[in-house]
């Protein structure tokens, strides 16, 4: 991710085709060592591609990924299908919560 961020920073600054040396210079300016193998792979993957198109394509792919309630609904449906097996697990969680609340011995750090 750090390599991609440096590459995009260079592209936004006007360098239309940043080299691995350019990316290394950006990373070293903030004290980060570049991973040569990953950097070369990134440069090879992005070579000749329009960054704006890649960003737009990535945004549409991210928009199609379910998040929030949809991800939580699937496990809930699976738990409802299991029936009685979910009830003991819920009781165990409640017991654990009580034990954790006793650990502060009545002194709330952020009360």
UniProtKB/Swiss-Prot annotation:
Region annotation (Disordered) ranges: 81-111
Xref: Pfam families: Ribosomal_60s
Record Gene3D superfamilies: 1.10.10.1410
Keywords: Allergen, Phosphoprotein, Ribonucleoprotein, Ribosomal protein
Highest taxon in the source lineage: Eukaryota
Coiled-coil segments: none
Alphabetized InterPro entries for the sequence: P1/P2_N_sf (IPR038716), Ribosomal_P1/P2 (IPR027534), Ribosomal_P1/P2_euk (IPR001859), Ribosomal_P2 (IPR044076)
UniProt cross-references to HAMAP family, sorted A to Z: Ribosomal_L12_arch (MF_01478)
Record's subunit section: P1 and P2 exist as dimers at the large ribosomal subunit.
Its biological purpose: Plays an important role in the elongation step of protein synthesis.
Protein family: Belongs to the eukaryotic ribosomal protein P1/P2 family.
Protein name as annotated: Large ribosomal subunit protein P2
Species of the source: Aspergillus fumigatus (strain ATCC MYA-4609 / CBS 101355 / FGSC A1100 / Af293)
